[in-house]
């Protein structure tokens, strides 16, 4: 294995993802794609401290812009099915060009290495990376090409800069799915292939009872489509709004299933979910948790006259995200703390309509609890809502195991959680997977065609020449969803 070396280092101005100020950071780019940033220039590169910013340039796309500042460049990549961006600026066009060339060079090398490894691994199977990838994830090739015409389009569930999410009904089965549609032009630069779709593989390979499964993925001439499970037991948000508060036992049940899913993502997939909030938690027909990936919020943050335009709910943002420091796996445990606080206390731990004041509360305010909360629950929530991710419960090297061993979860057999042996505390009153009683009547009563599929959108009418950037993108889960 090649030794990891520092390829380039130097000062960059990084723009905050949420509080959109520019902060100077000293960045090191390594040959393995690691791109890490520090407040001060590190004294000893052989004994680096924990960085403030830590991400990878593998499979990234690079863009140049002169807004909001001259000599700006953006690193864009697909995380799961969500497009994330990091924005930097430097002092001169030459300096920007230098960074872009080096980052692109590292990304290209990594892609080449991955392709070589896939060739070795695939043996007799097709030698191109994407073909081998499909061989790995799909036990049987789709019997027919999936197209947009096979669904009824019922309701817009979410909309963002890069696409939209629609509640759809598969005509053949009557089953409901969430279809996430991303515009190709934002993932593929003008003449440049984006090294994306790793997350397509993450989704295809993800097999966990409490995570939303990917049923199909396919493409049209201008879009990538992910068709994902849509659990019909209703949003947890809906049930909590109706009951105002859950018992500690009920919160423990949901919390355990969420921990099990996040543990799987962190340890098996090396994915930080980043977006845990009540609206992203649904119940299946039996009352088990399904964590969704329908969000377009991180994509919907606009640049505008005000530097603080948000999509979605900033109430869930962890302190390290607001401060634009490194957010590793511990960011998910903060999210768990917020949703479990809501379940047991009936309100958000920090809230103010004014975003500036809200950010101040998240960063500075001590957490308060209702008197009725038992000590074990207080201890768990205090641990999960620690401001410093290193001090946070789950913030150590043992990650989820720290939370699993907390006294609040004493008595929980974690293998039983995974195997769905625990009886859900609430069973949605649905009779089948096509029962829509927990769906908003506004969209179950009538069919709305969001985007009438035309012939151009039909997968079968699009030949490979017109979609060279995304070979072998189509996928169909074998067996039932």
Curated annotation (Swiss-Prot):
Glycosylated sites: 127, 130, 306, 313, 474
For this protein, the record's PANTHER family field holds: RIBOSOMAL PROTEIN S6 KINASE
| Protein name as catalogued | RAC-alpha serine/threonine-protein kinase
Residue stretches making up the PH domain? 5-108
Residues carrying the site annotation Cleavage: 463
Q: Which GO terms describe its cellular component?
A: cytoplasm; nucleus
Name the Gene Ontology biological process terms: cellular response to epidermal growth factor stimulus; cellular response to growth factor stimulus; glucose metabolic process; glycogen biosynthetic process; insulin receptor signaling pathway; insulin-like growth factor receptor signaling pathway; negative regulation of apoptotic process; negative regulation of release of cytochrome c from mitochondria
């Amino acid at each position: 294995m090649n030794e990891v070396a520092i390829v380039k280092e130097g000062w960059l101005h990084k723009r905050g993802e949420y509080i959109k100020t520019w902060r100077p950071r000293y960045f090191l780019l390594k040959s393995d794609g690691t791109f890490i940033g520090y407040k001060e220039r590190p004294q000893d590169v052989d004994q680096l401290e924990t960085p403030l910013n830590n991400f990878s340039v593998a499979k990234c796309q690079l863009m140049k812009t002169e807004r909001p500042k001259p000599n700006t460049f953006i690193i864009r990549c697909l995380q799961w099915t969500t497009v994330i961006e990091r924005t930097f600026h430097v002092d001169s066009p030459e300096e920007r060009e230098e960074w872009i060339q080096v980052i692109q060079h590292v990304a290209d090398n990594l892609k080449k290495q991955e392709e070589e490894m896939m060739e070795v691994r695939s043996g007799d199977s097709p030698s191109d990376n994407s073909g081998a990838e499909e061989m790995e994830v799909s036990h049987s090739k789709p019997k027919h090409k999936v197209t947009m015409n096979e669904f009824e389009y019922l309701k817009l569930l979410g909309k963002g800069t890069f696409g939209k999410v629609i509640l759809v009904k598969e005509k053949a089965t009557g089953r409901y799915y969430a279809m996430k549609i991303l515009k190709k032009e934002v993932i593929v630069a003008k003449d440049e292939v984006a090294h994306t779709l790793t997350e397509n593989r993450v989704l295809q390979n993800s097999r966990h009872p409490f995570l939303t499964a990917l049923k199909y993925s396919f493409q049209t001439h201008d879009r990538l489509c992910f068709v994902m499970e849509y659990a019909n037991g209703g949003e947890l948000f809906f049930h909590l709004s109706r009951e105002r508060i859950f018992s500690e036992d009920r919160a423990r049940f949901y919390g355990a299933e969420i921990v099990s899913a996040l543990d799987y993502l962190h340890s098996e997939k090396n994915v930080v979910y980043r977006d845990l909030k009540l609206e992203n938690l649904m119940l299946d027909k039996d009352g088990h948790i399904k964590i969704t990936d329908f969000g377009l919020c991180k994509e919907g943050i606009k640049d505008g006259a005000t530097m603080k335009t948000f999509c979605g709910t900033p109430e869930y943002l962890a302190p390290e995200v607001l401060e634009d420091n490194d957010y590793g796996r511990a960011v998910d445990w903060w999210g768990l703390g917020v949703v479990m606080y809501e379940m047991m206390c009936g309100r958000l731990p920090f809230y103010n309509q004014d975003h500036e004041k809200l950010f101040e509360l998240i960063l500075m305010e001590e957490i308060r609890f209702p008197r009725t909360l038992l000590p074990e629950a207080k201890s768990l929530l205090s641990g999960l809502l620690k401001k410093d991710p290193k001090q946070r419960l789950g913030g150590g090297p043992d990650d989820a195991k720290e939370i699993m061993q907390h006294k609040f979860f004493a008595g929980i057999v974690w293998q039983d959680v995974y195997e769905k042996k625990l009886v859900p505390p609430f069973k949605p009153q649905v009779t089948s997977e096509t029962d829509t009683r927990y769906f908003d009547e506004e969209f179950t009563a009538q069919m709305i065609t969001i985007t009438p599929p035309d012939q151009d959108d039909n997968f079968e009418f699009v030949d490979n020449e017109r979609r060279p950037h995304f070979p072998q993108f189509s996928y169909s889960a074998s067996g039932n969803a």
